[in-house]
């Protein structure tokens, strides 16, 4: 059996941006919560929006040409941490889980944040996202006080220092 081909791409064509919208919607659907408090619909319409380079990053993971996962990065001007950014929308489709793709996406976004010159990367996650929380801990993230209002019960706020 041949080894699957893995690519990380920045969506730049209308077709790839539409593929990004679809996987973001799939991500939101699996959360089972309303992301309206994050202006999710406006985010979808405006892609790449805040995730555009040079201050942001938007990644799709393709396995044998099929969209398997995504992750994004944006500047975070409202945090109590100087020169901070935020990781958003880390998601791997079920068929592609348990192969380390989530880790690769997260590490690629961490590298993009370092290259962009950020000092801190923050994210929020939910209590029931156990695999993601274990990954974040393994990558050196630590729990911090809330850096924005999230009305969803069980939200956790994490930070990693990029200069460490």
Which residues make up each language-model segment?
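C-terminal "cap" of GNAT-fold acetyltransferases
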Residues: 2, 7, 11, 119-164
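Acetyl-CoA-dependent GNAT
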Residues: 7-88, 93-94, 106-108, 112, ...
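Charged, low-complexity surface patches
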Residues: 17, 102, 125
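Conserved G/P- and acidic residue-centered "switch" motifs that form tight phosphate/ATP-binding loops
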Residues: 65, 100, 117
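Active-site acidic-Proline motif in GNAT/NAT acetyltransferases
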Residues: 93-99, 127-128
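Residues forming the Rossmann-fold NAD(P)(H) cofactor-binding site
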Residues: 99, 103, 107
């Amino acid at each position: 059996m041949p080894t699957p081909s893995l690519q990380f791409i920045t969506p730049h064509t209308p077709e790839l941006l539409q593929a990004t919208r679809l996987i973001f919607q799939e991500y939101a659907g699996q959360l089972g919560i309303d992301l309206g408090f994050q202006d999710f619909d406006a985010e979808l319409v405006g892609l790449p929006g805040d995730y555009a380079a040079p201050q942001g990053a938007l990644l799709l993971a393709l396995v044998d040409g099929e969209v398997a996962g995504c992750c994004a990065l944006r500047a975070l001007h409202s945090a109590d941490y100087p020169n901070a950014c935020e990781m958003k929308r880390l998601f791997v489709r079920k068929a592609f889980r348990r192969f380390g793709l989530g880790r690769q996406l997260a590490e690629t976004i961490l590298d993009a944040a370092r290259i962009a010159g950020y000092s801190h990367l923050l994210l929020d996650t939910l209590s029931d996202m156990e695999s993601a929380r274990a990954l974040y801990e393994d990558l050196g993230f630590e729990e911090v006080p809330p850096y924005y209002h999230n009305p969803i019960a069980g939200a956790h706020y994490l930070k990693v220092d990029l200069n460490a």
